[in-house]
Regions:
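An N-terminal boundary/leader segment
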Residues: 3-80, 293, 309, 316-318, ...
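Structural helix-boundary/capping segments
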Residues: 13, 63, 141, 192-198, ...
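Generic hydrophobic alpha-helical segments
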Residues: 39-43, 83-86, 186, 388, ...
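Glycine-rich, small-residue loops and helix-cap segments
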Residues: 46, 57, 101, 141, ...
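Short, conserved phosphate/pyrophosphate- and ester-handling motifs at nucleotide-, phospho-/glycolipid
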Residues: 46, 107, 247
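Long amphipathic alpha-helix in the N-terminal Rossmann-like dinucleotide-binding domain
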Residues: 77-87, 143-144, 153
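Immediate post-signal peptide segment of exported/extracytoplasmic ligand-binding proteins
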Residues: 86-102, 250, 280-290
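Short glycine/serine-rich loop/turn segments
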Residues: 99-241, 292-294, 341-342, 427-445
Length: 510
């Protein structure tokens, strides 16, 4: 097992004097709501101050961040200035936005103008983008207050947030265990109460899997509904951005704010922003919920039991359970680990020490390239670059990458047949609950299997989301994954809201 790095997170904070101040005043703002919807409603109505909301969340960060390490950077000064602007808008009678005063954490692979964006990699340590990602712009326009950049597996390559150059992010539910990945910092930030909302990216399950392991809601929307402009690319045909939240309504609220066409992203779907909140109370009566009969096996019994409980809850709410087949689903993991590394090997070629980021000086240009990339990239990133380069090489392209693309099409065809019979599909999000830190670090194949249920929807470009649905082994959260056809977010959120209501009725937390 490799040594665990517990980074001194103060290195990444813009301000050092706020920690003691916030710890001292940690209980001052105990009346702050926990959901983004309630916070925004209170700020807009004038019953809450955005600056008070922010200070309450900074106090929570000060109290627990040292144990969790959700953040690479907490942008205290910028957040306080943004919160003050929201309060000024309210006082002046201006519309502060639908997310007025809501603290939001951003995964550290999204460009933030003048604020470090590292992708948790030494090769980009200290790099400050000259522009904001479209999602960052839209959140700011909606009145959200960005509070920092969250930790991730380097360049979003991993399933545990152990592959960060800046240390491990620990699970707030049990700090001896992983938070999932690659958006583990974003999931942990919401689970720990550092922010009611965070934004992650999802290439093969990197929002949904950590959401399941941390017991929060995580959404990967349809490919192209949320702009990727300003997202540092891992695998461009698979990457998508989406929210984490403590409840379903908050994720709907955020998706409405960040979705919609963006001319800066050539893959952006030319459509209006998603409209989701109005469907949350509609129920699932008459909906067809698909059970995949040939789904890959191997999920823990506790996880399977919670999936069956979810089917029972939806049936009790009026849905019909139907069996569907996905014969190509068992090949999704193999296809993904050819396609994604192939795209990564191309996308990461730009980090060469010439234009930006780390440069290791050497005797000639080729030696500088090699030394820079050797020093700047971590082991998992190197592994995937080599795998992708091999798969794209002239002698092996047809045997590996070409076949993977054919499998990708077969999986899309399987989904099309399944959605002819069912409105949504239900699967586990992760085959296991959160595992101990270091348990799978030396076994990449075991780590890759954590995404066996999330990868297929990325290959097809469809929406999917994870909702917490009880607990499994060791009292740890279990997530259920809802899959829907392209642009099927409304029916997906109907089902999510129904599952959430059934958990509340049974006495479980949202």
């Amino acid at each position: 097992m490799r040594p665990l790095l517990k980074t001194d997170v103060s290195v990444f904070r813009r301000s050092l004097d706020w920690t003691a101040e916030m710890t001292t005043n940690a209980n001052i703002h105990s009346n702050i709501p926990t959901t983004a919807f309630a916070i925004a409603d209170g700020v807009r109505s004038g019953t809450l101050k955005a600056v008070d909301v922010l200070e309450a969340h900074l106090a929570q960060i000060a109290a627990r961040e040292g144990d969790i390490h959700a953040f690479n950077l907490v942008t205290v000064d910028e957040a306080r200035a943004a919160a003050a602007r929201v309060d000024a808008d309210v006082a002046a009678g201006r519309d502060p936005g639908v997310l007025a005063g809501v603290p939001i954490a951003l995964k550290d692979n999204m460009c933030t103008r003048g604020i470090p964006t590292t992708c948790s990699s030494k090769i980009l340590e200290g790099w400050r983008p000259p522009y904001d990602a479209t999602v960052v712009q839209r959140l700011a326009a909606a009145g959200a207050v960005a509070i920092g950049k969250t930790n991730l597996d380097e360049f979003a390559m991993g399933s545990s947030t152990e592959n960060s150059a800046f240390g491990v992010t620990f699970n707030p539910r049990d700090i001896s265990r992983v938070s999932g990945g690659s958006s583990g910092g974003s999931a942990a930030a919401v689970a720990a109460g550092f922010s009611p909302i965070s934004i992650g990216s999802d290439t093969g399950g990197s929002i949904r899997q950590p959401a399941a392991l941390c017991g929060v809601v995580g959404v990967k929307p349809t490919y192209g509904t949320v702009s990727r402009y300003g997202l540092v690319a891992y695998a461009s045909s698979l990457d998508q951005m989406g929210p984490f939240s403590t409840d379903v309504r908050d994720s709907a609220l955020v998706l409405e704010a960040i979705s919609g066409h963006d001319p800066m992203d050539s893959t952006s779907i030319p459509q209006a922003p998603l409209s989701l909140q109005h469907v949350l109370s509609q129920g699932v009566e008459g909906l067809r919920v698909g059970r995949i009969t040939d789904m890959p096996s191997g999920a823990d019994p506790d996880v399977t039991a919670r999936l069956e409980a979810a089917f029972d809850a939806l049936k009790a709410a009026g849905a019909t359970i139907v069996d569907v087949e996905m014969p190509s689903m068992k090949y999704a993991l193999t296809a993904y680990y050819l396609i994604a590394p192939a795209e990564a090997s191309s996308n990461l070629a730009r980090y060469d020490g010439v234009r930006y980021g780390l440069r290791v000086n050497a005797t000639d240009t080729n030696a500088m390239y090699s030394a820079t990339r050797t020093a700047g990239f971590g082991e998992e990133v190197k592994r995937r670059i080599m795998l992708g380069t091999y798969a794209l090489s002239a002698g092996y392209y047809d045997a590996y990458y070409g076949k993977a693309l054919k499998v990708r099409r077969l999986i899309s065809d399987d989904f099309a047949r399944a959605y002819a019979k069912a409105d949504v599909l239900l699967t586990p999000t992760s085959p296991i609950v959160a595992f101990p830190v270091g348990e799978k670090s030396d076994d990449p194949l075991a780590m890759y299997l954590c995404d066996i249920y999330t990868i297929p929807t990325n290959l097809a470009g469809h929406p999917a989301m994870s909702v917490p649905f009880g607990t499994g082994a060791h009292g740890l959260p279990v997530g259920v994954q809802i899959l829907a056809p392209t642009l099927g977010e409304q029916v997906m959120f109907k089902v999510a809201a129904s599952l959430e209501r059934s958990m509340i009725a049974a006495g479980g937390a949202k």
